[in-house]
Amino acid sequence: MERCRSGHHRIISYYLSSSLILFWCIFVLVLLSTTSTTNALVKIPKNTTVPAVIVFGDSIVDAGNNDDMITEARCDYAPYGIDFDGGVATGRFSNGKVPGDIVAEELGIKPNIPAYRNPNLKPEELLTGVTFASGGAGYVPLTTKIAVGGIPLPQQLIYFEEYIEKLKQMVGEKRTKFIIKNSLFVVICGSNDIANDFFTLPPVRLHYTVASFTALMADNARSFAQTLYGYGARRILVFGAPPIGCVPSQRTVAGGPTRDCVARFNDAAKLFNTKLSANIDVLSRTLQDPTIIYIDIYSPLLDLILNPHQYGFKVANKGCCGTGLIEVTALCNNYTASVCPIRSDYVFWDSFHPTEKAYRIIVAKLLDRYLNRFF
């Protein structure tokens, strides 16, 4: 803004009124904010624009939306964020960047996707994307209640509506529609439903079978994607569940003395993924628009876990934080838990969430496999 004023101030002021100067500066700011600000690693076709990355879901893509909440599902303290910019704990459930950040970086949009509820969020950040995701969220309403304070998906949509209104105030309705239509929407959810709801609460298993519960999850996921489509989104990635039975905490709790992957947890994840994939296919055919895509995250993460050395990892059955067996959120802290010296040796940061290195490998694979379906 200052550069706009200082370089040509005398000439501009001679020809234009101060109000027009202000308008011109705001226009330039908006233009720059909706143009790639980092070098794109993923090549997209010429004349194709991806102005923003907009994210919904759970702790995998939360960037700090829970930071001011009274909840166990928050991590705005060290050692979380030890490898993030400046070594700051922002509320990301990892040692560094999370998938939303990496997607935006790979597309050349910006280095990080900020949390929508960050009180220090700059207005121009809205133009290039935010995350509404919240640790503890799930497709089944009960799941978020278990987290005591997480933001359920319906509330994430309410924040999204608020976000749209803010965009309209900044750039007008026409530009807002363009941003929503051409942005990449990322939805990652489902792990908490299976691990923290179905397999943790006996009353849930009295009411549902694994088949009926995963069907409920898949139906709610389809409804969520359809709602985003109704808001004008046309590039929607809906991620399936990961191999939950192979994350360190679940191996510790239910994997027996040898901490094996828990087959029934993985089977539930695969069943959900099958139902979700079918639901997304039906939705795409119903809308006659193939711009809602199911993303298989199960296979690439499982490959890292089963074949860590092929990707430069040394440890895949424990997290880097503490003993690596059970530490997550409050148990992963600077007072009672040490941190492994070489984070890049580990697939998992804590007992539930991967390291930035693991996320980077997975995101690169997924973008290479799926992104061209939009263009």
Curated annotation (Swiss-Prot):
What does the entry state regarding organ or tissue expression? Flower buds.
Chief site of localization:
secreted
Tell me which residues are glycosylated: 47, 334
Subcellular localization(s) per the UniProt record: Secreted
Q: Tell me where the signal peptide lies.
A: 1-40
Report whether Hydrolase shows up as a keyword of the record.
Answer: yes
Q: What is its EC number?
A: 3.1.1.-
Gene3D superfamilies attached to this UniProt entry: SGNH hydrolase (3.40.50.1110)
Please provide, alphabetically and separated by semicolons, the GO molecular function terms listed in this UniProt record.
lipase activity
- PROSITE patterns hit by this protein: LIPASE_GDSL_SER
- Name the active site residues: 59 (nucleophile), 350, 353
Give all cystine bridges in this chain. Answer: none
Q: What class of enzyme is it?
A: hydrolase
Q: Which GO terms describe its cellular component?
A: extracellular region
Pfam families named in the record: Lipase_GDSL (PF00657)
Q: Which UniProt keywords apply?
A: Glycoprotein, Hydrolase, Lipid degradation, Lipid metabolism, Secreted, Signal
PANTHER family recorded for this chain?
Answer: GDSL ESTERASE/LIPASE EXL3, GDSL ESTERASE_LIPASE EXL1
Q: Which family does it belong to?
A: Belongs to the 'GDSL' lipolytic enzyme family.
UniProt-recorded name of the protein? GDSL esterase/lipase EXL1
Gene behind this chain? EXL1
